[in-house]
Structure formats: structure tokens, C-alpha cells
From Swiss-Prot:
It comes from Rhizobium meliloti (strain 1021). The chain crosses the membrane at residues 174-194, 210-230, 246-266, 271-291, 430-450, 458-478, 771-793, 797-819. PANTHER family: ATP7, ISOFORM B, P-TYPE CU(+) TRANSPORTER. GO terms for cellular component: plasma membrane. The gene is actP2. It catalyses: Cu(2+)(in) + ATP + H2O = Cu(2+)(out) + ADP + phosphate + H(+). One of its GO terms (molecular function) is ATP binding. SUPFAM superfamilies: Calcium ATPase, transduction domain A, Calcium ATPase, transmembrane domain M, HAD-like, HMA, heavy metal-associated domain. It comes from the Bacteria. NCBIfam families: ATPase-IB1_Cu, ATPase-IB_hvy, ATPase_P-type, copper ion binding protein. Pfam families: E1-E2_ATPase, HMA, Hydrolase. Belongs to the cation transport ATPase (P-type) (TC 3.A.3) family. Type IB subfamily. This is Copper-transporting ATPase 2. GO terms for biological process: copper ion homeostasis.
Length: 827
């Protein structure tokens, strides 16, 4: 059974939808949301990412987005919904309303749509970040109506607005909390730092009023700025699904509640234990809020690559309307529009130049440092910058179909994916928070039973320290933040990871297998030799061969036809043309049967090519690809073409060797030619004379011995090989990045991108391991310290205040370490 037939018989691929989620703070939240979503009927899988605050949900059939939204809400979190109000033109009756609603609801990412005939408006609820106006407009037009946007999104303007609002809210909360906590801290602990503070308080307001004031300040902190912890933590406790917020609530409430008892009814406590810990409760809230604020700022920096990509597209374009160019919103541009670009302006959408000449800076898209010349019929890409001249072009792709939109989607998909290395984290986070609560209970019991006097005070302080120091956030952020920054940095270098897991697999590669034509070489062969056999004229042979090759799409055919044109040789019509991949082409030209191909093609037809064995050996030794031509069943000529090696290829091979990788070349060329090229470039292994369908078997052979193989090809002809390899890398694809079989796409044809991708993969996985080590080592080592295991030997106990500071900084450390990937510059 062929691969195509297997695909045809396979089940349809699940539909994927992304959901923005508010309220997640730690890895336990991630696990809870995933569990809630996967319980929805029709959901195949759910992948929740704490760093991006998004869930990628795969559906088996028709997506039931409303059910997923309800599941997220039921789990205690808020799905991020944006509301668009749209003006619908052309509706006349209730049937129109039904038709428009149905069309809008069918758009991926639309949670609900309500259309009002009287006002001629539609209110559309969008899952934030998954659908844009152009998709809604296309749906409405497809139903036979016209649409125009009347006002911007109201409920949520998108991820950036959400992050900015959250950051502002946290900043205000931290400021208020600090202003109230500082005097509270000085009243209770000031005498440890400033002599005379205690006497001053006693001589002015007195001890009783001091306690009342501490109670008031601590209460304001807990139920003012700290109320966010209660709103999320308490419901999760009641659902028996505690999270990070629940730990903060338990710890601070225990300290505050004990202090309230000690303040107002101290007689119910054992003698000598009526101590207050108001400052501990307030400082814990303040430090955790500060940690959240710093974490939110760092999270914003991890997504800067996406922000930069989104910022590449201009808001308006000068479009030809009614015989003159007028400024129009980018959302109003449609395929077929004629657009004018002046020097220094950004190109708004993808298109083809119809007039003018200029140089365009495509570095932000392809990573190519030098501007590219654009003339008539040249393709231009939205988001690139016109440098010198003025050009006019016709729009070919707009909205979500543009290359820039596809790149953004690929990067977002990669950033939201999980790596195999995260499996351990997922297993641990399921029981981590309940285990911490159990540890706190055991700590309290142990100190209350066996601790020194006052045992109740010791038990309370140490139990609170255990609750506060535990940090599932660091574990939840360890992997996704590194993936976000790593894939974002890769995008800046023109490297697109279509699948996040390719980051890990690429790092494990042992062998890099390269297709020759178009990958190692420029893919533009040139005719270098044509030696006619006795009884044939060279120009006559070239005429017949070039005529036949006009119907072939192979690069070698283009070289032969181009050579004939340069000599002024006109081609003739061809009858009975046949092409056999990996062998050659045949047909009738001017009444004569012509066959052109490799030696195996002629041998199959019973034609002996040994008469040109000497020439073939010399041509092959010099790296040229020999072909043979037969006319009327007789050997007529040997033809040689040479495909120049890319200037960047030798350095790329050296870079791969420096990374400790074996380099192999897979080609359909004869062995002599292939080995000559391999020697010149320093390639370790050669798999020659491979038919297109034989590349898959070649990769399987290279994989023998347990080796992991990364295959680099053009992404189109090499699709089966790209899919077979452990990691498939499509190189030099230009504007075509929608290659399902490739795990990684290199925007430019520079093979150095392969070494950069591998180096970045290694750096990212190392960064993830550092984060995971820190997250696990932090919790494994400091939770016992907070419980007081060092006290019997050293007399050291960990204050809940220091526990809060350590917990707040642990997530910031993980994020800061991930951000180091932004400066990675692989050679």
C-alpha cells in the first residue's frame, strides 16, 4: 500500500482550537484545566500552557467550543472572550438572521453569535486570538451579505491588553500592600533594626492599641490586595483541587487567624503562646504579589518575538480605488487589489510586483541580511520593508493567508506545545499541592507533639513556612517559558519550529542527511558538456534533446532548454511524452524517437552506454552529472550538467561537524559524481543513485544502530523523507511554509540555518533542564528546611517571611533564566 493510500484510509485529523485562559498561577492549575477540558465529550486532547495562558484543544469531530468554555469556567478559571460588534448589510427577514448566525458560528474560534434584524448588528463572541475580522467577513459574504466593523472588541481586546491590564492591577496591588505592610512590619519588628522603636510605641499608643492597629493593617492587606488569592484559592479548596493560591490562603489565614485569637481572646491559648504574626501574614501577601508582578513582567518579555512579528504589519495601505490611490485599513484590502509602496514603507500584504523596481529588506521574515531586488513579476511579502524605489503590486494573499500570519501561527503553535521532557512535571504536579498541605499538617502535628515550648507557636510558624515556601509555579513555568523564548528567538533567525517537540528531537540528532539538489546546491543546473557519438551532430542532438525537455519540470531540463536558447536553437513539438522519475524522459520529436536519462534508463531500453565510459568517469570525477541521449534506439550523446554548490554550504558542513554530527548526502546522481561532491565538501557518508521513493529507505538505513536522523530537503519533492526522518527540516522554501511533513522550516536557502537550529535546540533543552533542576531542587531541599529538619542540629528555623521571599523569587529565577535564550546567537 502506498503512503498516499494509507493517508486516504486514515481517520480525519482532529480539529484544533486555541482558548485563552485567565486565572492560572501554577502547574496544578494547568493539570486541573487539562483534566476539565479532556472530560468534555468530543475532545481528543488538551494541551494547556501556563506561560502563554492558552489551551490547545484537539476535537475528534465538530468542535463544541461552548462546552469547553463551560468546562473551563466550572474548573474555576475564566476563558478569555473578545466581543466584536459587526454591522450586517442586506438582511430583510428572520431567515437572513438565521443564515448569518449559522455562517458566523461556523468560523473557527467563534464561541457564539447573535444577530439582531432591527439593528442590523451581530454580536460575536470570539475565543481571544483565534479568529480575525477577515475570517468573519468572508463567512458573512459567503452567506450572501456584507459586513463592516462598527467598534473594537469590548470584553477583551486581546492578549496584549489582558497582560497590560494584569500588570497594572498587580502593580497597584503591590504598591497598596507595601504602603500598609511597611508600618505594620516596623511596629512588630522595628526594634530589631532601630533601637527605641518598641519604647516609642509603648509610650505613645500602648501595647493594646498597637495590636489593634496591626490587626487593622493586616486585615486590609489580606482582604484588599490579597483578596485575589482568596477568590481563586478558596473555591479550589472547596472543590478539593487546591492550587498555589490555596497554599497562600491557608498559610496567611493561619497566621492571621491565630493572631486574631491572640489579640481578642488570648485566654483560650496555652500560657506563653499568645503571640501575634500579623506582620508575617501581610509580608507574605506583599512578597507573593511582588513575585507575581515580576513574573508577569518577565512573561511579557518571553512573548516579545510574537509582538515583533505582529508589529511588522502596517495598519493601512495605499490601494487603487476609482483610478486613484487612497489610504485604506489593512482589513479592507482584498486579493486582487493594486497597492502602491513608496521608499521606506512596509509592504502590507503578500503580492506580485506589476510595476517599478526596488530593493526590499526581508531580514525580519527570512533572516537574510541583504535587501532583495524586486522587479516586475517578483513576489513580495507582507511585513517586509521597501528600501529604495517605488513599486506597485497586486495583492495575492491577505489576512490569515499571508506569509506573516502563517509564521505567527506557526510560532504560536510551537510555543504552546509540550515536550517529552515535561512528562515528569505533569506527573508530579498532580499530587504536589495536596502533598504540601499534608506535609504542613504533619509538620504542625510533629512540632505540637514533640517541639519545645511554646509548642503551639513553633508548630504554627513551621507549618505556615511549609505552605508558603512550596512553589509549583516554578515547575509549571520551567519548560513552557524556555520553549517560548527559544522558538521566538528561532523565528527571529528565520527558523520556524512547526512542532515544539522538534526542539528536543533535533537536539538528539546524530546524523544530518542532506538532499543534494536545491539543498547543498543552488538547484539551478547549467549545461557544461555535450559530446556527440559518431554519426551525430552536437547541435542536432541539442535540438532534439531540448525539444523533449521543454515538457519536463526537472531543473536539469531547464538547464538544457536554456543552453539551446542561448545558441539560438528553436525547439519543436513533442508527441507521446513520458517521464519516469529517477530514470528519464522520452518522446517523439520531428518524427524521431528520443530518450534522455541516466545510464539505468538506457540500459532498461537495451541501449549500451559503455562507449562513453571514459567521458562519464571524467565528468563524474569533476562533480558533474552525466546523462545520455538516444535517438531511434542508438546512443547519440553524453550530456553533462553541473549544479553549482551554494556559497554557504562548505561553512554549513563545517559547523555541523563542529557540533559533533555526522553528515550524509542522499542523491539520485551516480556514485562517481556524488562521491566527488562529497569529497569536496567533507561529507562523511554518501547514499547515491537513489530514486525519489528510495529516500525513505535510505533514511532507515542511516538510522540503523540506533542513530537519530535529521533530514534536510526542499519540503516538496522530499515530503516522504521529511516525514520518515526523526526530524524533517525544509530548507529554502521562501514563501511556502505550509509543509505538513516538515518539523522545522528554514525561511532562507542558507544551510547554516541547520546548524543554527541544532545549536538553538541544544541551548533550549539545556535551559529547560536548568529550570527543571532549579524547580525540583528548590522544592525538595527547602520544604524540609521550612519544616524544621535543621533545628535539632543547628537550631535554625525558616521564617515564613523568608519562605515567602524565596517562593516569590523562584518563579522569577526560572523566567530570568529562560530569557537568557533571547541573547543566544548560534554561529
Amino acid at each position: 500500500m502506498t503512503a498516499l493510500k494509507k493517508i486516504e484510509k486514515a481517520a480525519p485529523l482532529p480539529v484544533s482550537t486555541n482558548f485563552g485562559i485567565e486565572g492560572m498561577t501554577c502547574a496544578s492549575c494547568v493539570r486541573r484545566v487539562e483534566k476539565a477540558i479532556t472530560a468534555v465529550p468530543g475532545v481528543a486532547s488538551a494541551n494547556v500552557n501556563l506561560a502563554t495562558e492558552r489551551a490547545t484543544v484537539q476535537f475528534d469531530g465538530e468542535p463544541d467550543t461552548l462546552a469547553v468554555l463551560h468546562a473551563i469556567e466550572k474548573a474555576g478559571y475564566a476563558p478569555r472572550i473578545a466581543t466584536e460588534e459587526l454591522q450586517i448589510e442586506g438582511m430583510t427577514c428572520a431567515s437572513c438572521v438565521s443564515r448569518v448566525e449559522k455562517a458566523l458560528k461556523a468560523v473557527p474560534g467563534v464561541a457564539d453569535a447573535a444577530v439582531n434584524l432591527a439593528t442590523e448588528k451581530a454580536t460575536v463572541s470570539l475565543i481571544s486570538g483565534t479568529a480575525d475580522l477577515s475570517a468573519l467577513e468572508a463567512a458573512v459574504r459567503g452567506a450572501g451579505y456584507e459586513l463592516r466593523k462598527t467598534k473594537p472588541a469590548e470584553a477583551s481586546a486581546g492578549d496584549e491588553d489582558h497582560r497590560a491590564a494584569e500588570l497594572g492591577s498587580l502593580k497597584s496591588a503591590v504598591t497598596i500592600s507595601v504602603l500598609m505592610t511597611l508600618p505594620l512590619f516596623l511596629m512588630e519588628m522595628g526594634s530589631h533594626f532601630i533601637s527605641g522603636v518598641h519604647e516609642l510605641i509603648m509610650g505613645t499608643i500602648g501595647m493594646r492599641n498597637n495590636l489593634y492597629l496591626q490587626f487593622a493593617l493586616a486585615t486590609l492587606v489580606l482582604f484588599g490586595p490579597g483578596l485575589r488569592f482568596f477568590r481563586k484559592g478558596v473555591p479550589n479548596l472547596l472543590r478539593w483541587t487546591p492550587d498555589m493560591n490555596s497554599l497562600v490562603v491557608l498559610g496567611t489565614t493561619a497566621a492571621w487567624g491565630y493572631s486574631v485569637v491572640a489579640t481578642f481572646v488570648p485566654r483560650v491559648l496555652p500560657s506563653g503562646t499568645a503571640n501575634v504574626y500579623y506582620e508575617a501574614a501581610a509580608v507574605i501577601v506583599t512578597l507573593v504579589l511582588l513575585g507575581r508582578y515580576l513574573e508577569s513582567r518577565a512573561k511579557g518579555r518571553t512573548s516579545q518575538a510574537i509582538k515583533r512579528l505582529v508589529g511588522l504589519q502596517p495598519k493601512t495601505a495605499f490601494v487603487l480605488r476609482g483610478g486613484e490611490f487612497v489610504e485604506a485599513q489593512i482589513s479592507e484590502v482584498v486579493a486582487g487589489d493594486v497597492i502602491r509602496i513608496r521608499p521606506g514603507e512596509k509592504i502590507p500584504v503578500d503580492g506580485t510586483v506589476i510595476d517599478g523596481s526596488s530593493y526590499v529588506d526581508e531580514a525580519m521574515i527570512t533572516g537574510e541580511p541583504l535587501p532583495v531586488q524586486k522587479t516586475a513579476d517578483s513576489a513580495v511579502v507582507g511585513g517586509t520593508i521597501n528600501k529604495t524605489g517605488s513599486i506597485t503590486f497586486k495583492a495575492t494573499k491577505v489576512g490569515s493567508d499571508t506569509l506573516l500570519a502563517q509564521i505567527i501561527k506557526l510560532v504560536e503553535t510551537a510555543q504552546g506545545s509540550k515536550l517529552p521532557i515535561q512528562a515528569l512535571v505533569d506527573r508530579v504536579t498532580g499530587w504536589f499541592v495536596p502533598a504540601v498541605i499534608l506535609a504542613a499538617v504533619l509538620t504542625f502535628a510533629a512540632w505540637y507533639t514533640f517541639g519545645p515550648s511554646p509548642a503551639l507557636s513553633f508548630a504554627l510558624v513551621n507549618a505556615v513556612a511549609v505552605l508558603i515556601i512550596a512553589c509549583p509555579c516554578a515547575m509549571g513555568l520551567a519548560t513552557p517559558t524556555s520553549i517560548m523564548v527559544g522558538t521566538g528567538r528561532a523565528a527571529e533567525l528565520g527558523i520556524l519550529f512547526r512542532k515544539g517537540e522538534a526542539l528536543q528531537r533535533l537536539r538528539d540528532a546524530d546524523v544530518v542527511a542532506l538532499d543534494k539538489t536545491g539543498t547543498l546546491t543552488k538547484g539551478r543546473p547549467e549545461l557544461t558538456d555535450l559530446v556527440a557519438a559518431e554519426g551525430f551532430e552536437a547541435d542536432e542532438v541539442l535540438f532534439l534533446v531540448a525539444s523533449l525537455e521543454t515538457l519536463s519540470e526537472h531543473p536539469i531540463a531547464e538547464a538544457i532548454v536554456s543552453a539551446a536558447k542561448s545558441k539560438g536553437i528553436a525547439t519543436a513539438a513533442v508527441n507521446g511524452f513520458e517521464a519516469t522519475p529517477g530514470f528519464g524522459v522520452s518522446g517523439s520529436v520531428s518524427g524521431r524517437q528520443v530518450l534522455v536519462g541516466a545510464d539505468r534508463a538506457l540500459a532498461t531500453n537495451g541501449i549500451d552506454v559503455s562507449g562513453f565510459s571514459t567521458e562519464a568517469e571524467l565528468l563524474g570525477a569533476s562533480g558533474k552529472s552525466p546523462l545520455y541521449a538516444a535517438i531511434e534506439g542508438r546512443l547519440a550523446a553524453i550530456v553533462a550538467v553541473s549544479d553549482p554548490v551554494k556559497e554557504t554550504t562548505p561553512q554549513a558542513i563545517r559547523s555541523l561537524h563542529e557540533l559533533g554530527l555526522k553528515v550524509a548526502m542522499i542523491t539520485g546522481d551516480n556514485r562517481r559524481t556524488a562521491e566527488a561532491i562529497a569529497r569536496k565538501l567533507g561529507i562523511d557518508e554518501v547514499v547515491a543513485e537513489v530514486l525519489p521513493e528510495g529516500k525513505v529507505e535510505a533514511i532507515r538505513k542511516l538510522r540503523q544502530g540506533g542513530r537519530s536522523v535529521a533530514f534536510i530537503g526542499d519540503g516538496i519533492n522530499d515530503a516522504p523523507a521529511l516525514a520518515e526522518a526523526d526530524v524533517g527540516i525544509a530548507v529554502g522554501t521562501g514563501t511556502d511554509i505550509a509543509i505538513e511533513s516538515a518539523d522545522v522550516v528554514l525561511m532562507s536557502g542558507d544551510l547554516n540555518g541547520v546548524a543554527k537550529a541544532i545549536a538553538l535546540s541544544k541551548a533550549t533543552i539545556l535551559n529547560i533542564k536548568q529550570n527543571l533542576f532549579w524547580a525540583f531542587a528548590y522544592n525538595v531541599s527547602l520544604i524540609p528546611v521550612a519544616a524544621g529538619v535543621l533545628y535539632p542540629v543547628t537550631g535554625i528555623l525558616l521564617s515564613p517571611i523568608f519562605a515567602a521571599a524565596a517562593m516569590a523569587m523562584s518563579s522569577v529565577f526560572v523566567l530570568g533564566n529562560a530569557l537568557r535564550l533571547k541573547s543566544v546567537n548560534p554561529a
